[in-house]
Amino acid sequence: YDPIAQVWNKFDGATGKVVNISDAIGYPMFMESYDKPAPAPAYGIAGWTADGNNVFLYDAYDWWKIDLTGERQPECLTKGYGRKHGKSIRKMTSNIDKDVFQKDEKVIVSLWDKDTMDEGVYQLDMKGRLRKLMEGNYVYTIHRFSDNHEYCVWNRQNVSEFRDLWWSKSDFSNPVKVTNANPQQADYKWGTVKLIKWTNYENKENKGLLYLPEDYDPQKEYPALVQFYETHSGELNIYHAPLLSSALGDPMYFASNGYIVFMPDVHFTVGTPGQSCYDAVVSGTKYLIEQGIAHPGKIGLQGHSWSGYQTSYLVTKTDIFTCAN
């Protein structure tokens, strides 16, 4: 991968010739949302065919089969399904995942919805056919398949469900929960989370996570904590075990103690990170005020390290926050 030209190349060791193999795809092969002052990295390689004549490359959504002999044009193995449905299709990690695929290979892949943040576990064959195995408002992790490939141990999580282990057949049918590692959660008030969207001061859609107390009453006023570090919306279905921290505060700890926690995504324009932060964080906070969720005089701001700099910037530009850390 050439990060400056943002293309994939093949190199012929016999002739020393370098040939661009990704321009013909027609979609960017680099991370388009990359907002750091450095060349954007590639989405990556999924694997190779067993004969070594083809490589599978990722774009933002799909798999592309590239013929390294140059005889055939790039082919979208997943037939554009990911882009059409807004889902990123990626190989899942396990003890049996491979980088080299036989013609009859069936690969376990994740389909992650970039809008809802839900995830599905699918089977992808080398003809591009997808078969759904399980799906939901979870993040799934595969731990291990049995040596005979008949059974599997895996887990799932979301904001209220701990990462307990599950056992099932290798196609994830007949699942059985085999651990209950966090029973003490039932003894505490917990919380909920939802993905919210608003228009920021750059006139772009902005996303963020809003954590609410378990017994949230929209008729009452709650103290609100606004905290951020780059992006958070992709963490919608991540379980947070309450803990103390010297960096960002744990959202479920605060929600359990009667706080609203707002974690907006911040996307940066290179060279003006402070203003980018202002456009996202302040617009999102004012959106919550307009919706009657947050209330002036009861809004705190929290940032750490890189977002600590941005917090220092924000308090020189607005008085919307009662206190800042």
Stretches found by the model and what they are:
Residues 141-325:
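Serine-hydrolase catalytic core recognition
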